[in-house]
């Protein structure tokens, strides 16, 4: 599993992270750790295949998780005013793995 930690992002900020295709194939699971000062929306953008999934593992101040389309391109958008940390897991295959 590849773990990527993104810098803390603040309210009303959008962070895009693109996973290189070769890395995505080598590491079918990726964990994004995001420090947030607002609620969080995570979108999978584009088109890769029909088996991409996204899972909110933990979120002390996250109220929304939105998966749209399928590709190793993750957009993290924060809104609102509450603080906390969110851990989001994305990958390909049959679904989240333990």
Where is each model-derived feature located?
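C-terminal interaction-tip segments
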Residues: 1-26, 80-98
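A short, compositionally biased N-terminal segment around positions ~18-40 that is enriched
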Residues: 20-38
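Short proline/glycine-enriched turn/loop motifs at strand-loop junctions of beta-rich domains
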Residues: 36-41, 82-83
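Exposed aromatic-hydrophobic patches
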Residues: 17-22, 62-69
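Noncatalytic modules at the cell exterior or secretory-pathway interfaces
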Residues: 26-32, 68-87
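Conserved Ser/Thr-centered positions that define the repeating blades of beta-propeller domains
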Residues: 45-47
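Surface-exposed loop/edge segments in extracytoplasmic proteins
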Residues: 1-6, 50-58
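Short, solvent-exposed loop/turn segments in extracellular or other extracytoplasmic domains
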Residues: 12, 58-62
């Amino acid at each position: 599993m590849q773990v990527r930690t993104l810098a803390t992002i603040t309210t009303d900020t959008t962070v895009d992270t693109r996973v290189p295709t070769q890395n995505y194939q080598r590491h079918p699971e990726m964990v994004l750790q995001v420090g947030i000062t607002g609620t969080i929306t995570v979108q999978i953008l584009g088109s890769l295949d029909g088996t991409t999934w996204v899972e909110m593992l933990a979120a002390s101040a996250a109220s929304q998780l939105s998966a749209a389309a399928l590709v190793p391109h993750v957009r993290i958008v924060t809104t609102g005013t509450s603080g906390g940390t969110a851990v989001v897991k994305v990958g390909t295959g049959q679904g989240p793995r333990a």
